[in-house]
C-alpha cells in the first residue's frame, strides 16, 4: 500500500520531473578525491533553512526562534511577598528585639491570588502569603519565624527595613525588555520565561522530517530469526537515533532489498513527508549498489569520492518536485555514522536554522602516538580524558575497521587526523568531535 494514497505504479514514477539542478560540484584534487570540507560545504550550499511557522512554546524546545520576543508585561506584575508572614510598615517595627518585642493588631489576610487591600493603616499588620500582593503603604514583610504567629495580634521580635522580603514589580523583567533574540536556541528555562510573560506561540524553524532507509537484501529487522547469510539491520536504527539526537523528527522506514524498482518506489513514496531522506548502502562500485544506479532517475544527484576514512563513497541529490534533499551514505555501520557526523548533522542543523551549522570541536592532546594515511582525513574513534587540572587528552579505541560497532559504542569522540600527516606524536594537539555533548 503506497503512502498517503499516492499511485503505486511505473506510470506514476515515469512522470516524476527532474526539476532540480545541482550547483557545480567542487573540483576534485589530483587524486580524484574531494576533501571532507569541500563536500560538507557543497551540501550546505545545496540546502535551505526550513520556513518558520508559529508553534506552541512547549513544542519549541531546542528549536531556533525566528523573531525577537519582547515582554509585554512586568515580572513580577506587582509588588509581592517573598515570604509567608506579616505585611508591615517598617517604621512600626524598626526597634523590635527579642527583649523588647513589638505587638501589633492583625487587621486582615492577603492570600496568593487575592486582591491587595488599598492601604495598611499605621500601627497594624496583615497576614500575607508568599506571592500575594503587598498592601498599599506596607513596605516590608516580617516572616512567620520572627513572630509568635498570632492571628488577632502578633508579637514581632526582629526589626525590619523598608523593602525587606518584598519582590518589586518589574525587578526581574520589565515591560519592553528583550527576552529572546531571533536566532537563539530555545532552552528549558526559555520555555518557562515565555510562559511567564504570557507567550503561548512563537515563530520557529521546525524540526526537519527525516526519513531513514537502509538497503541490502542481507538485512533483517532485530528480533527476527537470522538465516546463515543474513545480518541484523543496525544502520537504520543507528542513523535514525543520530538524526533524532541532532533534533530531527525521524521516520525509520527500515530496509529495502537489492531491488531497483522497490527502492525507487519506496523513496518516491517518502517524498510526501520528508524534508530530508537518508539512505545507507549502495553508493560504492559493486554490482548490487542500487542506490547509485536508481536515485538519479528521481532527480539531480552527485556521487563523489571523499578523501576521508572511513566514509570515502558519498552521494547527494535533490529529488522530486519539491527538490527534497537526499544524502546517500556508505553501508558499513561505522562509515555511515562517521559520515553522518561529518555531513548530515551539519545539514540538519542548517535546516533547523541552528548556527553554527558545523559544531565547534574540542582541542585535545594525543595520549599516545597515532598513525594515519597521508591524503585522507582520518576520523578515528577515541575516548577523551581529563586530569585534575582540566587538561584533556584523547586516546584511540579499537581498530580501523568500518564495521566495528562495539568499538564505536565505547568511543565518546571522533579524532580528526589531518590528511597531510602520517604520524602524530604523543602530546600533539588534535581536533576532536565529542559525541556525547548536548546538541
Residue ranges and their predicted role:
Residues 57-58, 67, 113, 173, ...:
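Flexible glycine/proline-rich
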Amino acid at each position: 500500500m503506497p503512502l498517503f494514497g499516492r499511485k503505486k505504479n511505473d506510470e506514476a514514477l515515469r512522470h516524476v520531473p527532474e526539476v532540480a539542478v545541482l550547483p557545480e560540484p567542487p573540483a576534485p584534487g589530483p587524486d580524484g578525491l574531494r576533501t571532507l570540507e569541500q563536500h560538507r560545504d557543497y551540501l550546505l550550499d545545496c540546502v535551505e533553512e526550513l520556513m518558520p511557522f508559529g508553534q506552541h512554546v512547549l513544542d519549541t524546545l531546542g528549536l531556533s526562534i525566528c523573531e525577537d520576543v519582547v515582554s509585554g508585561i512586568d515580572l513580577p506584575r506587582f509588588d509581592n511577598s517573598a515570604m509567608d508572614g506579616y505585611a508591615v510598615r517598617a517604621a512600626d517595627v524598626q526597634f523590635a528585639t527579642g527583649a523588647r518585642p513589638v505587638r501589633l493588631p492583625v487587621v486582615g489576610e492577603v492570600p496568593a491570588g487575592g486582591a491587595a487591600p488599598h492601604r495598611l493603616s499605621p500601627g497594624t499588620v496583615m497576614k500575607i502569603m508568599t506571592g500575594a500582593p503587598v498592601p498599599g503603604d506596607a513596605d516590608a514583610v516580617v516572616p512567620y519565624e520572627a513572630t509568635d504567629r498570632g492571628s488577632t495580634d502578633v508579637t514581632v521580635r526582629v526589626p525590619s527595613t523598608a523593602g525587606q522580603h518584598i519582590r518589586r514589580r518589574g525587578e526581574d523583567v520589565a515591560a519592553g525588555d528583550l527576552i529572546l533574540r531571533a536566532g537563539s536556541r530555545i532552552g528549558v528555562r526559555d520555555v518557562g520565561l515565555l510562559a511567564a510573560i504570557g507567550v503561548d506561540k512563537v515563530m520557529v524553524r521546525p524540526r526537519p522530517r527525516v526519513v531513514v532507509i537502509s538497503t541490502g537484501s542481507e538485512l533483517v529487522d532485530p528480533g527476527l530469526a537470522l538465516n546463515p547469510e543474513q545480518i541484523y539491520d543496525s544502520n537504520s536504527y543507528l542513523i535514525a537515533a543520530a538524526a533524532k539526537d541532532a533534533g530531527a523528527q525521524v521516520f525509520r522506514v527500515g530496509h529495502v532489498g537489492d531491488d531497483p524498482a522497490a527502492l525507487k518506489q519506496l523513496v518516491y513514496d517518502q517524498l510526501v513527508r520528508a524534508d530530508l531522506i537518508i539512505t545507507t548502502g549502495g553508493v560504492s562500485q559493486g554490482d548490487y549498489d542500487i542506490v547509485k544506479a536508481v536515485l538519479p532517475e528521481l532527480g539531480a544527484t552527485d556521487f563523489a569520492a571523499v578523501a576521508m576514512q572511513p566514509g570515502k563513497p558519498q552521494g547527494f541529490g535533490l529529488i522530486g518536485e519539491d527538490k527534497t534533499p537526499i544524502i546517500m551514505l556508505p553501508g558499513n555501520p561505522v562509515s555511515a555514522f562517521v559520515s553522518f557526523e561529518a555531513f548530515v548533522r551539519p545539514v540538519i542543523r542548517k535546516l533547523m536554522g541552528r548556527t553554527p551549522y558545523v559544531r565547534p570541536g574540542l582541542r585535545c592532546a594525543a595520549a599516545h602516538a597515532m598513525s594515519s594515511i597521508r591524503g585522507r582525513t582520518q576520523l578515528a574513534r577515541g575516548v577523551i580524558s581529563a586530569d585534575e587540572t582540566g587538561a584533556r587528552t584523547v586516546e584511540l579505541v579499537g581498530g580501523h575497521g568500518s564495521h566495528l560497532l562495539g568499538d564505536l559504542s565505547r568511543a565518546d569522540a571522533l579524532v580528526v587526523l589531518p590528511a597531510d600527516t602520517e604520524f602524530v606524536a604523543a602530546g600533539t594537539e588534535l581536533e576532536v568531535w565529542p559525541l556525547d555533548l548536548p546538541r
